[in-house]
């Protein structure tokens, strides 16, 4: 089982100074976020299946199951931080003086 690292620089689109905003970037970022959530869901499912298999049938290695659980936990914490940042940004937008 290989562990894949999450690299934020590869997820975010590259932007250069003076470049005008394109509408495609907004949908692209949304698709990237959706893909990240799908990946997180798959990781959670794999971890739950591994735990279930280890406890019921004894299949699998305890250290591999622990690694999968920690990976799933890390992805959940990352999603929670992103959620908190989005909510905080939204609150700041609401409080802006027009």
Curated annotation (Swiss-Prot):
InterPro entries the UniProt entry points to: FliE
Main location class: other
Domain of life: Bacteria
The UniProt record lists the keyword Transcription: no
Record's compositionally biased regions (Polar residues): 23-56
Molecular function terms, GO-annotated: cytoskeletal motor activity; structural molecule activity
GO cellular component: bacterial-type flagellum basal body
Region entry Disordered, spans: 22-56
Pfam family, one: FliE
Keywords: Bacterial flagellum
Annotated localization: Bacterial flagellum basal body
A GO BP entry: bacterial-type flagellum-dependent cell motility
HAMAP family for the chain: FliE
Family: Belongs to the FliE family.
Name used for this protein in its record: Flagellar hook-basal body complex protein FliE
């Amino acid at each position: 089982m290989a562990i894949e690292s999450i690299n934020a620089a590869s997820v975010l689109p590259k932007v250069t100074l003076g470049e005008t905003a394109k509408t495609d970037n907004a949908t692209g970022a949304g698709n990237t976020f959706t893909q990240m959530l799908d990946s997180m869901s798959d990781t959670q499912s794999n971890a739950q299946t591994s735990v279930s298999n280890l406890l019921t049938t004894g299949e699998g290695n305890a250290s591999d199951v622990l690694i999968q659980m920690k990976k799933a936990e890390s992805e959940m914490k990352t999603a929670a931080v992103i959620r908190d940042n989005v909510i905080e940004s939204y609150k700041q937008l609401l409080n802006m003086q027009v």
